[in-house]
Amino acid sequence: MNDVAIIGVGLHPFGRFEGKTAMAMGVEAMLAAVADAGLRWSDVQAAAGGSWTAANPDAIVGMLGLTGIPFTNVFNACATAASAAKACADGIRLGDYDIGIAVGLDKHPKGAFTEDPALVGMPRWYAENGQYLATQF
């Protein structure tokens, strides 16, 4: 088994960015991570990521430049980025590739995530207690 190390990190600032999509913010974060690692996008051999708001987060590799790398879509609510990082690390650990990148990206409107938390398996009392609200700016 191969050792795994995080060699670069990128983060888009938190906040409200009118006119900028979640995918565009994800691209900025991924480019920052690649630069932080001292690499080029063409050095990345695989990616994993997910999003609540973007139905096709794998399309982000096309925004960065199609290089033919595999992209694993994950969805695990607020733990999606952590699940993507684990999927990426597992691929490296198992020897599938040497350099991977993980991304989690979302852009929520102000207020409740959905009108009905039951749509995502949450009980109604979750919303009734005010526990289903996005951060307000």
Predicted features and spans:
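Short conserved active-site loop signatures built around small residues
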Residues: 81
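Conserved "HGTGT" condensation-loop signature of ketosynthase/thiolase-family condensing enzymes
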Residues: 1-75, 90-94, 105-137
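Short acidic donor-binding loop at the edge of a beta-strand
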Residues: 98-99
